[in-house]
């Protein structure tokens, strides 16, 4: 005999349990739409990272083979100045783009445009100041970096002088590629950097092979590459996918730049510690080992740039996408994003690791090794050094992820350890100990890098546990706030009838009033019908989320169809007459739209 009283009590308890945990039956989003867009960002991201790092690697290879190994070392000795020159463009570009992503996720286009305009102007002005200082300061700076007045000092002076002159161009270029990623144009950002570095590659060969410019030509080709490729930004200016526009700013409006600075603190710390890292490592290696140690370190550092070049583009998708998802409180999407990026990154890293271990000798020859005793030392050091890339990639992921969810303290902590606090003592200790073993100490450089990355991973785990007790690595919840119905449908008319039914059933189970439930169901059905009719061939999946928070009912619809802003729609012809849009506007409390991650995102509240 069935005990109906117990059965009703069981059903009631199950309903309460679902309310606490989220709607398990309703959480049927398949994430195909988001995964499709992430795949679209990955290739441009890799190309952008490849192009960004390729300039440094190409300069090093050409300089070592067409001038000398000393000239190659001068490129590395110039890194502290290069870091300072790039500081404004990098920090305001990354910090600004993440902050703008959060603003766009909240549908605040006005503030986003103000921040974009302010960061552009500040980057340009700071770059011009560097240009004015180039001629009077290049010589004394070079003597500080390379004391003793050797040929290495002259090479360093010539290289940094051109870098400082080109600061406005480099700064604006670096700033814009970050904004293009969050502005639905990741492919344009990657094309810009690829083209800039193709130009750099061609000019490098011409200047070093056929002109007396010497190392000055290597630096000049980088600046000219960034400059000549800027015509591509005209495509962005004319794009109908833009959310950001240049606006006239009053003096008080520049206060908004603090948003970019606060969000970009991890990058600011990274650039500042990179300066300390470059200066500190150069000093330690030159004093403890000498120019041979500097040559070996330059090769190892360029291999790390290759790792950065291939995996950094994948990890670099996180700031472009996670900031917008975080602004929308789409925590499920953030989890999907991170797992996918980590999976792809470590697959690529495994291939790089095998390649370096297999072709170590050939790699060192590429960077000017003659295969003698110095070449042998390079091979041994590089085979030890490559083991640092496994924890290095994890630390890079941590920085990108935590700054995207506004956990800048943890991101800065990682950067501070990895680039200064742990690295310099570890490298000094590694050289000192290895010198006792073999009398040379070069392998100690590699050992110091491995120790640094492992220490950083462990220390960051402890720091996160102290700051966020009982939290998971992600810190954000694994479910979206409120009680959610989250599902996906194919972009097909056959699917639309299920939208109305699912929303009505969900609202009935949650005790939502019949009137509000019907409003939500009608709005969702009307919007999906319009998307399917007019979304174009690119529209294949539609994500629908209905969130209940206290007295608020919020409907979010996301699709990858053609650009369509329902807020700007007006009836203009019988051929293109979307009556449902007007109905939705009338029955909803508010309606917001944004084109983000190259998708239409519409939020309707009741």
Residue ranges and their predicted role:
Residues 93, 97, 162-182, 189-197, ...:
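Short runs within selected transmembrane alpha-helices of multi-pass transporters and secretion channels
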Residues 54-73, 142-150, 206-213, 272-302, ...:
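Helix-terminus/linker motif at the lipid-water interface of multi-pass membrane proteins
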Residues 466-521:
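Bergerat-fold GHKL ATPase/HATPase_c domain
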Residues 72-132, 173-182, 188-189, 296-354, ...:
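Small-residue-rich hydrophobic transmembrane alpha-helices
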Residues 2-42, 100-166, 213-264, 322-388, ...:
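Short alpha-helical transmembrane segments in multi-pass integral membrane proteins
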Residues 514-539:
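Conserved ATP-binding N-box helix of the HATPase_c
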Residues 553-581:
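Glycine-rich/acidic phosphate-handling loop/turn and adjacent ATP-lid/helix
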Residues 40-60, 162, 173, 196, ...:
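Transmembrane helical elements of multi-pass membrane transporters/channels
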